[in-house]
Amino acid sequence: MPKNKTVHENCDILVVGGGMAGTGATFEARHWGRDLKIICVEKANIDRSGAVAQGLYAINCYMGMRWNENQPEDHVRYARNDLMGLVREDLGYDMARHVDSTVHMFDEWGLPMMKDKKTGRYQREGKWQIMIHGESYKPIVAEAAKKSADKIYNRIMITHLLMDENKENRVGGAVGFNMRTGDYHVFRAKTVIVAAGGASHIFKPRAVGEGMGRTWYAPWSNGSAYALPIAAGAKMTQMENRIVLCRFKDGYGPVGAYFLHLKTYTQNANGENYEKKWYDQTKELV
């Protein structure tokens, strides 16, 4: 039986995770660091990995600043109300002011976007979302990452960040193993960007059997984005927030298409539109 190898790599920027965040970070790193050696490491395959692996029917945030539809301040206000004040407004503002240019980039790269034939604007699903034909969403962004990175490592599960032996509280790389061969990989880097997955299925989902792997969010998001920096001593923020998504019988996908695009409503076992029935009482509670 062959002995597992230890593979060493040195680079300027190491991106941990090859989902939408990781592939985007790889592209952005190349934009600002033309001469840097950039490596992206993904536990699956970047073509179909992360929460957007199978595609989406919508981009869930687009300001529309070029048409004066929304401004970053509007999104900060929305987030503040939605999270009852438990929000880093500076982070929300930064995300909101950059999101439009990112969407325009997707459009340029060939992502099929639904547009109003008269105005040319992106078709809205609600106040923030825009509609797309998103089966190719992830492969398109993965292609940009492939062109940007010096190397892409697929099937490598990063387990720990390495601390710099010369500088206190500084990360100097990461280690992991190949999930197919068992080979051990050691990455030394001047900068490490952790863009791994969040944590899904913390609570047991209602979906069982075959439906277990079809729930939203991605079942393979095991909290690496939190565990890796926490183990290295990083200060975390916004960890007091979590999202618990309500779903319907036999429906595993996002509900935005039902309510916002198709203008449907929900009813209880008695056939009643319960949201409308209890709307006034619910407002009093809130």
Language-model features: locations:
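Short, well-ordered coil/turn residues at beta-beta hairpins
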Residues: 17, 189, 195-196
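Conserved N-terminal/central alpha/beta ligand/cofactor-binding core
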Residues: 4-5, 36-37, 42-172, 178, ...
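N-terminal Rossmann-like FAD-binding beta1-loop-alpha1 element of flavoenzymes
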Residues: 13-40
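Core beta-strand elements of the Rossmann-like FAD/NAD(P) dinucleotide-binding domain
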Residues: 8-11, 181-191
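Generic start-of-chain signal for non-secretory N-termini
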Residues: 1-12, 20
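Glycine-rich loop(s) and the adjacent beta-strand/alpha-helix scaffold that form part
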Residues: 194-253
